[in-house]
Amino acid sequence: KVTTGDSQVMLALASGKSIRFEEAKTRPMGRTASGVRGITLQHENDEVIGMVAVNDMESNILVVSEKGYGKRSKLEDYRITNRGGKGVKTLNISEKTGDLVAIKNVDDSNDLMIINKSGLTIRMAVEDLRVMGRATQGVRLINIKDSDSIAAVAKVAHQEDADEVLEEGAEDAIEDGTENDTDTKENQE
């Protein structure tokens, strides 16, 4: 997502911490510059797992752990701080939840696609997830085996919206008389 210069930035760590700061606190730099510190890592094996550019202050923050737990929290639960700090707890990390693997900026008009490493993919409406406090464990979003973990999380357009667009496109094609203009296997045989 493109920032506006007035956006806010959120960074999240695998250890379950995140930080929110003003984009204006990072000065423009050249391509070869090493950058500035966004968040302080908790330990030597910690890593930044994601970044969100926040332009809509009414949106929610969704986080997902490697063992399929996740939650959605209000953006206002994360106070604005200076970049480079330790951050605040965004998910209660435990052996049950595993490390944090994804952070997304969502609202009720989004769906969530979750893929685990064994290839199972699920799609769920963000509006089905209740808003929870910032420092909670979350709820199980996907059942995974002990040896498996989450591979990827993506925010996509809400399914009903996609169906409506397809239906409108089909209606337009019928009105234009172009519904049979596409080459399908059946038409080619």
Name each model-derived stretch.
Residues 1-189:
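C-terminal interaction appendages of subunits in large macromolecular complexes
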